[in-house]
């Protein structure tokens, strides 16, 4: 017997600073669907997920709660595992970066970097974003904030170890160019090459000495290992790399697919490959950066408070409707919208009307006309061939779709068969055949073809919607559900008993359910909504230091290579100034030209994205940063006027 093909897929390991949201669920459900599909095809497949538990942010949250970091993450991790159980995630291993085996392996990895001369000790001085666990230079900041998440950064200076990233940059560029599928989609590959690698890599800070919640460096224990070095190593330490038990590593590495969100693809396609090169290990075969789930047009984020709780959706609608929406409605590789109304309408149209109706009608007719017993297909006609051919060709189409990570298209192909089977019922009119005793054999053949088509549907749908696939198999008493069995349209045994059972997907009153969800969301917001804490008290002398002036916007244009910055030329009492402002997500340049706004006029000039900014435009934002408004000034107030 030949050895099974191997398949190793990973999700990111999630940062347990709070409960996970539907965006995190998306990555994990997609990975689960892919690994289940490979198992169906007979692969020896392994799925890894887990949690990234170290770092300054976790330590601060735990301190605020008066508990240890480990106690805090233990509680969050339990919730994550419960969520994956609810979502029917079939992972093979859940790694925690606090696991002893991982800690020891990471220490060995860093020691090897040190022994090979890849890291050195120096001092770091710059800006640090605690939520992102990222370091930034002055020129990389946007309006003095983190360019990734837009939150405040802290000035930090401390002794640290650095990795010589530039040593491997040319080698990585060549590897990416020689392996066009290594980074996908194509747009992500181009971004990594043109925005990060080719302009030149800076050495990476890989340790911290200002806090202690992390893995200690064995040869300098006042340092803990920077969280990304710790986290990225999980993909090999989970398999036993660096331990005495490395059987899984030898079996499954290199990974076939790292599936990650586009916001962390830089770490997975630059830092991680360079780490592997330094360790003289093979690189993963592919890193795929999917898009974001957007709510009301904006990115979903725990910090913004606009997250969709998957537990609420599961409790209201069940697991498979949530999986279906995520897998089918989000273009894989692009951003997608999560919307309650679209979600419920898709349940009604695709799951209840198309699939649920087909199963119910088929089972009901077999019960009604043949006492629940499937008849042999002895009276075939030409009209049967299109349905049969579509079923037989389905596995090959799905195989091609999954190889290219076209998950929505794979579900489309399954639904093509579902819709064709529904049309087949209308074409063959079983209820008319049932009235003619001489047509009983033909009626039995039609119903056999429907059950056999549903065998193809149930078998291929199970990786994507596990509960639904199993329910169909149970109702129709499907016994043969292997990939090999899909090579022929004859896997249903005549004489098999079927039972109609419960409706798989009841229809939902859209307006009523949306109203219920909106009320539930408002209650949750009320429970969590808090005013931002006031800043420390200042004196009137501090207020007097601010020079707030009315200015008029003369010109405005986007800043190249920035998603947030606009460059404004403003007039201040006869003087012209250039100001950069991070408001491009809220204003088009043409909307600002001619407006009078408020400027902090005596702010020390600074360079942002390499361009001079002589002041700061004042604006007010909602708590979740989803909306922002400049302070508009009446036209009759002259520029240069003091705002008191």
From Swiss-Prot:
Xref: NCBIfam families: metG (TIGR00398), metG_C_term (TIGR00399), PRK12267.1 (NF008900)
Enzyme class: ligase
Cofactor: Zn(2+)
Subunit organization: Homodimer.
Cellular component aspect of the GO annotation: cytoplasm
Domain tRNA-binding, chain residue ranges per copy: 542-644
Protein residues bound to Zn(2+): 129, 132, 146, 149
UniProt keyword terms in alphabetical order: Aminoacyl-tRNA synthetase, ATP-binding, Cytoplasm, Ligase, Metal-binding, Nucleotide-binding, Protein biosynthesis, RNA-binding, tRNA-binding, Zinc
Official protein name in the record: Methionine--tRNA ligase
GO molecular function (one): tRNA binding
Binding site for ATP: 302
Keyword RNA-binding attributed: yes
Cofactor note: Binds 1 zinc ion per subunit.
HAMAP family: Met_tRNA_synth_type2
